[in-house]
Regions:
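Substrate-binding rim/cap in mid-to-C-terminal beta-strand-loop elements of soluble/periplasmic
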Residues: 1-47, 51-66, 88, 152, ...
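Flexible loop/turn segments at secondary-structure boundaries
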Residues: 17-18, 77, 105-106, 168-169
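Long, internal low-complexity/basic segments
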Residues: 136-157, 162-232
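Short intrinsically disordered coil segments
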Residues: 23-27, 111-118, 174-177
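Active-site-proximal beta-strand/loop segments in catalytic clefts of secreted hydrolases
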Residues: 12-14, 72, 100-101, 163
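C-terminal cap/loop subdomain of S1 sulfatases and analogous C-terminal strand-loop tails that border
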Residues: 40-158
């Protein structure tokens, strides 16, 4: 939630019924494009799978905003060859389900600074006194658990109960009591990825790991792996 839960305030005096309302529906950033088109009297193209917010503006019930979908690929050049950490997630009122497509990669970047463009360990986390402290005392009682959450590997699936664990500290995925919830959210997420033709699901070319990197490079010889010829 720290990366994706952002308040949204909208003002449109002539287009919002009963202004001043607080809406708890989930909004994806991509929903803004069809909203602007609809507001301008235009029909969103069929390629747009996001949903307009106009029904919410008009104080009508909407079935299209009951969950938020989140995605991540490469954030920083902190793995060998410029590889990212691909994951997709679905956030509902009660749960957060995350699917990590490459669980053998370091989510916060490699601990080996020589494979990081900026020559720092765990490059997804910027240098700071807090990071330095956690790295230096990561084996100390009271710090080890936090350090593992910050720097450690993650399983292929994560599931958090936001009512009992709002800070998402305890991964429930794989436990019997939440098996049905996990399966339901997994299906909803993967159905959405199929609808949006996400290549991580459809089997098409996945080029995100091979995109050029435009950040600072301090490590001599560091570069992004070239795109495989089969994907040209």
């Amino acid at each position: 939630d720290d990366r994706s839960r952002v308040p949204l305030a909208i003002r449109w005096p002539t287009g919002i019924t009963k202004p001043g309302r607080t809406i708890k529906d989930f909004i994806n950033l991509s929903d803004l494009a069809p909203t602007f088109l609809k507001a301008a009297g235009l029909k969103p193209p069929s390629m747009m799978t996001a949903k307009s917010l106009i029904p919410i503006f008009e104080n009508r019930l909407s079935k299209n905003h009951k969950a938020a979908f989140i995605a991540m690929e490469r954030h920083d050049g902190c793995r060998k060859g410029g590889k990212g950490y691909p994951c997709r997630a679905i956030r509902t009122s009660n749960h957060l389900y995350i699917h990590n497509f490459e669980p053998t990669r370091w989510p916060s970047g490699s601990p080996d600074p020589s494979v990081c463009a900026r020559a720092i360990p765990y490059g997804e986390i910027d240098s700071s006194p807090t990071k330095t402290f956690m790295m230096e005392y990561r084996n100390k009682h009271g710090i080890a658990r936090l350090a593992e959450l910050a720097f450690g590997m993650r399983p292929a699936e994560e599931l958090y109960d936001l009512k009992t664990d709002p800070h998402q500290m305890k991964n429930l995925a794989g436990s019997l009591p939440v098996a049905k919830t996990q399966a339901t959210l997994r299906k909803k997420l993967f159905d959405h990825l199929k609808t949006t033709k996400d290549p991580r699901i459809t089997g098409g070319p996945v080029n995100w790991d091979n995109y050029p990197y435009y950040g600072v490079i301090y490590t001599k010889g560091w570069s992004v792996n070239p795109k495989p010829l089969a994907q040209e």
